[in-house]
Amino acid sequence: MAVQISKKRKFVSDGIFKAELNEFLTRELAEDGYSGVEVRVTPTRTEIIILATRTQNVLGEKGRRIRELTAVVQKRFGFPRGSVELYAEKVATRGLCAIAQAESLRYKLLGGLAVRRACYGVLRFIMESGAKGCEVVVSGKLRGQRAKSMKFVDGLMIHSGDPVNYYVDTAVRHVLLRQGVLGIKVKIMLPWDPSGKIGPKKPLPDHVSIVEPKEEILPTTPVSEQKGAKPEVPVMPQGAPVPTA
């Protein structure tokens, strides 16, 4: 017999499950460009779609790695055998995914690249991918013993209001270097896309669209037309009998 739980508890348990799953996959697939997870629940099974930039690495040789991940998720969250399926989906626009770019910057810094050069490289790639604006902040012991932060900004970025929730993609990552831990924050402002593929369908509240006037079709032959003339009232002849109702 299924245990009945309230709607509030159901929302909380679903949120905890997704947060734990996201944390686990972030640790496991950080090197494979992990960018997020989607959970689809059907009456018969639960489908977990892993979004990554390198899907081949997520799948592994002959699908071995994805099977191992499925077994771990099944055991950890108590799913019945065969009721959970894991899929790997490639991120369509890597440059517009804040998580992918934060991980990219993290590995650049781990590789020994200078902070300024690494940040400008990420900034340029994001803007070339079609973003309206981006902001990269790196903080920590960048030079010397005193901690400071460096901010790199390009394009347009909104910071307040409801549109921030669906127009700005944010990611925070930490990287452990010899001098200490550096914090990385990447914010990307997505472009407006009516199809909803690379950005939100809903335009910004202050967006102004100018409608082009319709083309006026000119007549090929000259036409004379009398406009605004009063209709002529028929004059009754004198001596005619007046009609009565």
Swiss-Prot record:
One of its GO terms (biological process) is cell division. The keyword Protein biosynthesis does not apply. Coiled coil: none annotated. It catalyses: 2'-deoxyribonucleotide-(2'-deoxyribose 5'-phosphate)-2'-deoxyribonucleotide-DNA = a 3'-end 2'-deoxyribonucleotide-(2,3-dehydro-2,3-deoxyribose 5'-phosphate)-DNA + a 5'-end 5'-phospho-2'-deoxyribonucleoside-DNA + H(+). One of its GO terms (cellular component) is mitochondrial inner membrane. It is a peripheral membrane protein. Residues 21-92 form the KH type-2 domain. CDD domains: KH-II_40S_S3. PROSITE patterns: KH_TYPE_2, RIBOSOMAL_S3. InterPro entries: KH_dom-like_a/b, KH_dom_type_2, KH_sf_prok-type, Ribosomal_S3_C_sf, Ribosomal_uS3_C, Ribosomal_uS3_CS, Ribosomal_uS3_euk/arc. Keywords: Apoptosis, Cell cycle, Cell division, Cytoplasm, Cytoskeleton, DNA damage, DNA repair, DNA-binding, Lyase, Membrane, Mitochondrion, Mitochondrion inner membrane, Mitosis, Nucleus, Ribonucleoprotein, Ribosomal protein, RNA-binding, Transcription, Transcription regulation, Translation regulation. It is found in: Cytoplasm; Nucleus; Nucleus, Nucleolus; Mitochondrion inner membrane. GO terms for molecular function: class I DNA-(apurinic or apyrimidinic site) endonuclease activity; DNA binding; RNA binding; structural constituent of ribosome. It comes from the Eukaryota. Its EC number is 4.2.99.18. Residues 215-245 are annotated as: Disordered. Component of the small ribosomal subunit. The ribosome is a large ribonucleoprotein complex responsible for the synthesis of proteins in the cell. Has endonuclease activity and plays a role in repair of damaged DNA. Also involved in other processes including regulation of transcription, translation of its cognate mRNA, spindle formation and chromosome movement during mitosis, and apoptosis. NCBIfam families: PRK04191.1, uS3_euk_arch. PANTHER family: 30S/40S RIBOSOMAL PROTEIN S3 (PTHR11760), SMALL RIBOSOMAL SUBUNIT PROTEIN US3 (PTHR11760:SF32). Belongs to the universal ribosomal protein uS3 family. This is Small ribosomal subunit protein uS3. It comes from Ictalurus punctatus (Channel catfish). The lineage of its organism: Eukaryota, Metazoa, Chordata, Craniata, Vertebrata.
